[in-house]
Amino acid sequence: MQRAMTVVPHLGLRLQALPLALGRPLSRAQDVLRRTPLYDFHLAHGGKMVAFAGWSLPVQYRDSHVDSHLHTRRHCSLFDVSHMLQTKILGCDRVKLMESLVVGDIAELRPNQGTLSLFTNEAGGIEDDLIVTSTSEGYLYVVSNAGCWDKDLALMQGKVRELQNMGSDVSLEVVDNALLALQGPTATQVLQAGVADDLRKLPFMTSAVMEVFGVSGCRVTRCGYTGEDGVEISVPAAAAVRLAAALLENPEVKLAGLAARDSLRLEAGLCLYGSDIDEHTTPVEGSLSWTLGKRRRAAMDFPGASVIIAQLKGKVQRRRVGLTCEGAPVRAHSPILNMEGTVIGTVTSGCPSPCLKKNVAMGYVPSEYSRPGTPLLVEVRRKQQMAVVSKMPFVTTNYYTLK
């Protein structure tokens, strides 16, 4: 879910999510990178470690990026996402605090229900995307991006201090847990063997605390960043390796890294913060208007509401769209042109789709060019290639609902 751009020569892939150290061995100077509790586990299993958002994480393992991607779509893969910021918001004013920062209707969440939401600024720009869960234990569980760690923490802590100065009992705790994502059509079948809870009763975007393969105190949330069914497991750091090893004993499960995670999320039409959305992009421009709670729209009481609601009611100048493209792989920053050859926009993410066997991308174009089926051009290495505005997700998502 983040950020600078780097080429991985041996993968033939450019990952918008990864910073400039990607694809190079970590030097001694880079040893200051933070390590997840699974660092040694990754090395023992052939993980190729790269720098990402201040952390050392595996970009892939012994399997190729494409093999890992397809295994996730057909079976399930285990991802280490422990670099994500996990926080608890406690106190009677926890909902008030969160709703002062995000666009979603947090008050309407049922116990253990979560939602994707957005931190916004007064100009309507997106400061980060995050998942907020209203737990039955009486706190909000928040997961946000590693690349926005300091910014997000400062934002929430600032609001905590503001409310505390007014006599509120609200407080914030950073959750020092590992976070494992088990993703794919057989993920919950694998997990069910290690839990007493009936996972059929845990639909998409709901959460529960349970014992997982003998590890107590795990929060299991049915969500992910691949478009597949699956879970994210917040597990006490000291037990992370034990849990990962237990999951990996099932032949359905393989380890996967950042490379597969990026192409999976792009096929699913999911945004990468810092590339597809940023502080200068509004939810309407980013095609994320669905994150705006109905009550919040009416009250206009979130940061940037006047700008965002005006765009909802009027006409927005640009929109995020999906593109399917001919020719060479399309990368971020590639110009988008109309059929007359005039530059009208920019690609923000792109890769060859392992499932579709063609190039897919996201980018921003003027609203009049955003209708699916609109023919356009993209420029790759100074050559123009055909592209068509396409509906997202590019690959059908398989979220588990009870409907």
UniProtKB/Swiss-Prot annotation:
Extent of the transit peptide: 1-28
Source organism of the structure: Canis lupus familiaris
GO terms for cellular component: glycine cleavage complex; mitochondrion
Family classification: Belongs to the GcvT family.
Record GO biological process: glycine decarboxylation via glycine cleavage system
Keywords of this entry: Aminotransferase, Mitochondrion, Transferase, Transit peptide
Protein name, UniProt field: Aminomethyltransferase, mitochondrial
Residues noted as binding substrate in the record, renumbered to the chain: 232, 261, 399
Subunit structure: The glycine cleavage system is composed of four proteins: P, T, L and H.
Job of this protein: The glycine cleavage system catalyzes the degradation of glycine.
Cell location: Mitochondrion
GO molecular function: aminomethyltransferase activity; transaminase activity
